[in-house]
Amino acid sequence: MTRHLLTAADLSRDEATAILDDADRFSQALIGREVKKLPTLRGRTVITMFYENSTRTRVSFEVAGKWMSADVINVSASGSSVAKGESLRDTALTLRAAGADALIIRHPASGAAQQLAEWTAAEAGAPSVINAGDGTHEHPTQALLDALTLRQRLGGIEGRRVVIVGDVLHSRVARSNVLLLHTLGAEVVLVAPPTLLPVGVRQWPVTVSHDLDAELPAADAVLMLRVQAERMNGGFFPSAREYSVRYGLSDKRQALLPDSAVVLHPGPMLRGMEISSSVADSSQSAVLQQVSNGVHVRMAVLFHLLVGAEQEAISA
C-alpha cells in the first residue's frame, strides 16, 4: 500500500479488502475490554488538521488513534498560527519538523491533501498523509467505512447494486464511493437532478438516472447525500420542498425497497429533506453502524500506513 491515503483510487481490491478485514479484527479485539486500548501505535504521533467543521470524521480519527495508544494532537485553524496568517505549507512543514508520524487533513480546497503530501515529502521521516475530505474532491475513509457497513449487512459487495442519491456535484463522498465500490465489484447508480451532476459524469463507471422511484426496487443499498447548500452560489433546484418530493427518501419510497436493502447516509442528515426521520431511524438504516465502523476502519488505515500490512494487525 502507498504511504498516503489521498484518494480511493490509491487502493487496489486486495488493499481495500485487507483494510476492511483488519477493521473487523480491530472491532473483535475490542469486544469485552474494560479499557479500550491496543498497543499497536504506541510511541506514534498522529496530528489531525481540520480546517472545516466535522463531528463524525474528526472524533472517529481521534478515537481510532487513542484506542491504538497513539499520541493524538488536534490542530484547528482558529487555535493555531493559521489564524495569524500562516500558510498551510508552513504549518505542514512545522508539524513534520515536530515529529508527526501521520497528518490527517480536512480542508475546503480540493487537492489540499495531495499538496500536503508533496510539501512534507522527505527521504526519511516524512509523515503519512490521510485525506479526511478535501473540498468536493474525495473522502476515501468514508468510502471504506461505507463498504465495511455494506459487507456486514449484505454479506458481500461483489455484484451488489448501490444507488447513490442527491447532490453528487458537491459530494466528495460520492466520488470516493464510486471509485471504491467499482474496485470492489459493485454496480453503482447515481440518481440526481441534472444540475447536481458533475460534468463528464457519464464517463464514470456508473449508470446515471433522474428517476429515483424506478431505481429503488432493484437496489441492494441506497446512499443518501445531503444537499450542500454551503457550496452553492446559485439555484440548483426550484425549492427544498420540490427537491424532497423528487429525490428524498420518504416513508412511501422506502416501501419500494427490497426488505433486505440497506439505507446509508454519511451525515450530517437533513431530516425531512433528503431522508425522513422514520426512514433514518428504521431497521433498514445503518447510519449508526456507519459511525461505529468509522472508528474501526480508521484504526485499520492508520495501522496499514504506519505499521505495515505484513505485521500482525492485533497485538493482544
Swiss-Prot record:
Pfam family, one: OTCace_N
GO cellular component: cytosol
Family, similarity comment: Belongs to the aspartate/ornithine carbamoyltransferase superfamily. ATCase family.
GO molecular function list: amino acid binding; aspartate carbamoyltransferase activity
Cysteine pairings via disulfide bonds: none
InterPro entries the record matches: Asp/Orn_carbamoyltranf_P-bd (IPR006132), Asp/Orn_carbamoylTrfase (IPR006130), Asp/Orn_carbamoylTrfase_sf (IPR036901), Asp_carbamoyltransf (IPR002082), Asp_carbamoyltransf_Asp/Orn-bd (IPR006131)
Residues that span the membrane, as ranges: none
Reaction(s) the record says it catalyses: carbamoyl phosphate + L-aspartate = N-carbamoyl-L-aspartate + phosphate + H(+)
GO biological process: 'de novo' pyrimidine nucleobase biosynthetic process; 'de novo' UMP biosynthetic process; amino acid metabolic process
Keywords: Pyrimidine biosynthesis, Transferase
Keyword Glycoprotein listed: no
NCBIfam families: asp_carb_tr, PRK00856.1
Residues reported in the UniProt entry to bind L-aspartate: 84, 172, 226
Summary of the function given for this chain in its UniProt record: Catalyzes the condensation of carbamoyl phosphate and aspartate to form carbamoyl aspartate and inorganic phosphate, the committed step in the de novo pyrimidine nucleotide biosynthesis pathway.
Name under which the protein is recorded: Aspartate carbamoyltransferase catalytic subunit
Assembly with partners or alone: Heterododecamer (2C3:3R2) of six catalytic PyrB chains organized as two trimers (C3), and six regulatory PyrI chains organized as three dimers (R2).
Top-level enzyme category: transferase
Record-listed E.C. numbers: 2.1.3.2
Pathway annotation from the record: Pyrimidine metabolism; UMP biosynthesis via de novo pathway; (S)-dihydroorotate from bicarbonate: step 2/3
Positions bound to carbamoyl phosphate: 56-57, 106, 139, 142, 267-268
